[in-house]
Amino acid sequence: MSRSPSLPDRPTLDVDPESTPAERLNALQDHYVDIVAVNGELQAQLDDVEARREELREEVNRLQRENETLKTASLYLATVEDLPEDGSAVIKQHGNNQEVLTELSPRLADTLEVGDRVAINDSFSVQRVLDDETDARAQAMEVDESPSVTYADIGGLDDQLREVREAVEDPLVNPEKFDAVGVEPPSGVLLHGPPGTGKTMLAKAVANQTDASFIKMAGSELVRKFIGEGSRLVRDLFELAEQKDPAIIFIDEIDAVAAKRTDSKTSGDAEVQRTMMQLLSEMDGFDERGDIRIIAATNRFDMLDSAILRPGRFDRLIEVPNPNPDARERILEIHAGEMNVADSVDFSDLAADTAEFSGAQLASLATEAGMFAIRDDRDEVHRQDFDDAYEKLVAEGDTESSGPRYPSYIQ
């Protein structure tokens, strides 16, 4: 039987019978050295084989787990709607909203609660309880525990800032003022105006000043495909705010779910209206939620349903227009505050030349001016850089909806 070619050759001892004892001793010593060397090679190969065996064992275990996963039937998501006292449960399957009465195992009967999210099999038996649904849906929400925007970062919105502080900051920081006067603070604040005028910055700055968590959600995220999903997300939004209070809820693009109702009978429009009804319901009970305030923003104030604007919901309507020349000068000074700007740059002249620019566009103007300076390998921003940036933004505005061409459509 031949040996593996990967094994080292076995050393052999050839001793001449006619050799002297000293020569025999030297031969034995050389043979011993050869044996030790071969043993080292064999030990190294053994270590490699054992390492490879361990890798193969891990691969086998992984494949076995994958095989078990492939053979395991998928589970469906459902919500517990009711828990009768006979050990059963009424569950509603997600997607088709089918309600089923199913028996619970003794292990789950004592721990399950109404509203829990569960996994069920094809026979509608509850297999396990899932994590809090609010956590699973938090990906649709932007939660900022401590916004970095301050009042100093906002320019040209002194009147709007004062109104927002009165309606949001004072009820959280100085509630005794309202108790002393005997009035209730506004239930909600609606910011309306063209895009890029600083509506989100206003909300973040107030959250920073009050040390409140900032929970932002776009209204379009509340528009869901399946029946009941949007309403459930609205409930999750307010439940998350309760967990993180003091908190400020900011709903951007609220017109996506609060547009004027029509006679349309399509399922999509009906679902949007159900979502709006859930939002109104949550706001009607808002005064019992403690240190939670709500702010919404829209670019299309003219599209909002009258129900969302009635007293007790959004009590304070604040228009955030494009900045005037003085406000534009202040905004430019803020955004260029950290830039190395040449002394020859006059922000008042720039403000006069940027009529109808929004705050966001002025921020882009400062950034683009800095980019032109970098392009010319300079560490100082000149007036010509701002002029080049202006021309660039205007040119982009001719082909995109983001240029300095916003109409004043807020009536």
From Swiss-Prot:
Keywords: ATP-binding, Chaperone, Coiled coil, Cytoplasm, Nucleotide-binding, Proteasome. SMART domains: AAA. One of its GO terms (biological process) is proteasome-mediated ubiquitin-dependent protein catabolic process. GO terms for cellular component: cytoplasm; proteasome regulatory particle, base subcomplex; proteasome-activating nucleotidase complex. Residues 35-75 form a coiled coil. Residues 408-411 are annotated as: Docks into pockets in the proteasome alpha-ring to cause gate opening. One of its GO terms (molecular function) is ATP binding. InterPro entries: 26S_Proteasome_ATPase (IPR050221), AAA+_ATPase (IPR003593), AAA_lid_3 (IPR041569), ATPase_AAA_core (IPR003959), ATPase_AAA_CS (IPR003960), NA-bd_OB-fold (IPR012340), Nucleotidase_PAN (IPR023501), P-loop_NTPase (IPR027417). ATP binds at residues 196-201, 335. It is found in: Cytoplasm. Homohexamer. The hexameric complex has a two-ring architecture resembling a top hat that caps the 20S proteasome core at one or both ends. Upon ATP-binding, the C-terminus of PAN interacts with the alpha-rings of the proteasome core by binding to the intersubunit pockets. NCBIfam families: PRK03992.1, PrtsmActNtasePan2. ATPase which is responsible for recognizing, binding, unfolding and translocation of substrate proteins into the archaeal 20S proteasome core particle. Is essential for opening the gate of the 20S proteasome via an interaction with its C-terminus, thereby allowing substrate entry and access to the site of proteolysis. Thus, the C-termini of the proteasomal ATPase function like a 'key in a lock' to induce gate opening and therefore regulate proteolysis. Consists of three main regions, an N-terminal coiled-coil domain that may assist in substrate recognition, an interdomain involved in PAN hexamerization, and a C-terminal ATPase domain of the AAA type. Belongs to the AAA ATPase family. This is Proteasome-activating nucleotidase 2. It comes from Halobacterium salinarum (strain ATCC 700922 / JCM 11081 / NRC-1) (Halobacterium halobium).
